[in-house]
Amino acid sequence: FWLEHDLSGIPEDSLKNIGCLQESQVLTSVPTDVFNAFSTFVTLLEDAKVIRGVAPVFAPDLLDVYAELAAKGIQIELVVTREVLENMLELADRSPLKDQLKANLRLFVIEQNPKTVFTVTDYFFMVGLFRLDGSYDYSDQLLSYSTEGTGWGRELFDHYLGASEEFDLRY
């Protein structure tokens, strides 16, 4: 997994502690289920109490998932690139759950491309990376349920949160 991906989005301090992810599993999409990793991710989100993520890529279907979770009172914090923010805002304006999104979603904008896509919750950490050719790898994701793995993910999130600025959703 690691050798096939661009690790430049992971800070050096985090790379030194990558052993915290040793109990992880790789979720791979297969020809009979090309959305295996994404489907698993959405299912896992449904049981989360807190969701924090970094997203330099955009999956429109995910905004509906976040809106439904926000409507249930789940607190969501996302660090996104400006391009992803613009796409999210355009779709959010059309969402019937727009008010719930505003109440329970905090968006932070980062100017640099993090080159890593991940979510950390109260019970799992899931990360996707870009391939060495620069394209995002939608088919392989690394998933950890361990305390060490989620702790590693929280530290990575804090790194990117510190490099971002909050966007005011009260538009």
Where do the PLM segments sit?
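HKD-type phospholipase D/PLD-like phosphodiesterase module
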Residues: 82-123
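Residues that form generic nucleotide/phosphate-binding pockets
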Residues: 44, 100, 156-160
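Interdomain hinge/linker segments and adjacent boundary elements that couple functional modules
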Residues: 1-60
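Primarily the HKD phosphodiesterase
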Residues: 41-96
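Cysteine/selenocysteine-centered motifs that mediate thiol-based redox chemistry or coordinate metal-sulfur cofactors
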Residues: 155-171
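HKD (HxKxxxxD) catalytic microenvironment of the phospholipase D
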Residues: 106-150, 157
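A structural signal for well-ordered alpha-helical scaffolds and beta->alpha junctions
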Residues: 34, 38, 90, 146, ...
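Residues in well-ordered beta-strands of folded domains
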Residues: 27, 79, 108
